[in-house]
Amino acid sequence: MVRMPCSLYMREPHSHRRAGPLGALGTRRSASSEGSFQSEGPTRPMRTRRRRFRIAFRVAKVLLVIVVLFAVAVGLLFLLTPSAGQATALVRAQARDRHITYPGPPVPAYFAQALVATEDHRFYSDPGVDPLAMGRVVISWITGREDQGGSTIDQQLAKNLYTGGHSGFTEDLEQLAMAVKLNQTYSRPQILRMYAEVAYYGHGYYGLDAASCGYFGRPPDRLTLVQAAMLAGVVNAPSYDDPLVYPRQARTRLVHVIGRMAAVGYLTRAEETAALNAPLGLSAVRGCA
């Protein structure tokens, strides 16, 4: 028997790893398939951004619809609310009920400056309402919370004259409409004078004349800067800032008012310092001599 060499039965080492055309093609296909799998579709951060954008867009559309409906409601109220031409008659009626005279003395410059600086620093340029106030009313309606934002002087006057001092969604809408009407009907000095006469100053005093005589024993035209600033500041929270009952709170409020007058340019820093160091001069005797 002839024996064959062993080498004929042995495979060449690593011959099974040789990459033929099909093997190379298969390798390339695998790499291609892997690459296409990795690039298939947007990445997760991109999908998250798109989802957030869609949500924000939907929320914006809902808010836009609410604002449009709100504007329509204000427009209807503008047509349905009474004329602002009767405002002076309403002020006179309130003054008569409280045994005070309207029109009273002119509003002193210091009082007007302090009131505008603290309550409505755009009083001489705004249309009677703060554009942001409309948004606050909508938010308060959606959340069910009372609007704590600041109101213009025209809005506060409308609140006192037309809604009985009450607040609520419909009352706030009416106040916005009437504030615009008041702004279109009366001059700025007339608005200030009406406001000064119907405002409550605490301690039972309605009207600037009664408050000036009650707290300081002098008419409004003789008020000092610090006295006028105190009266302008107390109308925001008359029961809480009553200087005869809560002098510490009244002092804090006075410092704020004086600071606002300086911030908007009515007072220099030297005048601000002098006012903060000036005596308030509360009278022990109620009423003007």
Task: Enumerate the language-model features and the residues they cover.
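Juxtamembrane regions of bacterial inner-membrane/periplasmic proteins
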Residues: 2-289
